[in-house]
Amino acid sequence: LLGLEWLIVALSGSNFFLYSLTSSHTLYNISYFFDAFSRAFGFPIIAIAGLMSVTHGYKPSTLADAGLFVASFAATFVLVAVDAVVPAKPWFYLLMWTVYSVYLSYFAWRLWRAGESGHALGLFLVMLCGQAIATIYDFYKIPGDDKEHTLFYILALSTWACMLTQTYYAYRALEIDGKDPEGISP
C-alpha cells in the first residue's frame, strides 16, 4: 500500500515538473488529479492502512487493497470533477491531512515506546511540517511568493520528500523492532 501511494506521489510530482517545462495542460491535469488523490485519500487512508501493518498487524488481502484504491480513485474523481464540492475541498483536504497527522503522532509514540526515539522525533517533526504545509496550501499565501507559488512548492516538496524518507525509516524501525504489533511480548 505504501509503495503504491509513493508511486502516485512520484507520478504527480513528475507530471507537475514536466508541466512546468512544457505548459501542457494534460500533464497539469494528471498532476492535479494525483495531488487530490494523495491529499484526500492516499495519505490519510491508504498510507495509514499500510503503516498499520507494523502498528496493528493489519494485512489486507490483494482484493481489499485493490478495492481501497478503486474506491479512492472514484472518490477523487468526484472531488476533481464535481463543481458542487469545490467550496468544501480545501477544508476536506485539511481535515484528511489532520487525520493523517494524528496517526503519525501515534506512530511516533509507538516508535518512542519501542526505544526508537530518534525516529520518533524525526517523524513527529516532519508531521508538524506536513501539517503546516497542509494548512498553508489552500488558505494562505506566503509573503513574497510569486504567482507560481515557488516558495510554497520549495517548502512543500522538501517537506514531503523528508516525510516520505522519514516514514520509510520509521516503518523499518518498527518492523525490525519486533513482530508483535502491540508491543506485548509473550
Give the role of each language-model region.
Residues A47, A108-P186:
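C-terminal transmembrane-bundle signature of multipass membrane proteins
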Residues L2-L21, F34-F41, L95, L125-F139, I154-S158:
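Hydrophobic alpha-helical transmembrane segments of multi-pass membrane proteins
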Residues L1-I8, Y58-F69, E116-V126, P181-S185:
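Membrane-interfacial loop-to-transmembrane alpha-helix junctions, especially the N-terminal start
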Residues A40-R113:
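Membrane-proximal helix-loop-helix units in multi-pass membrane proteins
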Residues Y28-S31, A75-V82, D145-I154:
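Membrane-interface segments at the starts/ends of alpha-helical transmembrane spans
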Residues S12-S38, A84-P87, I142:
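Helix-loop junctions on the outward
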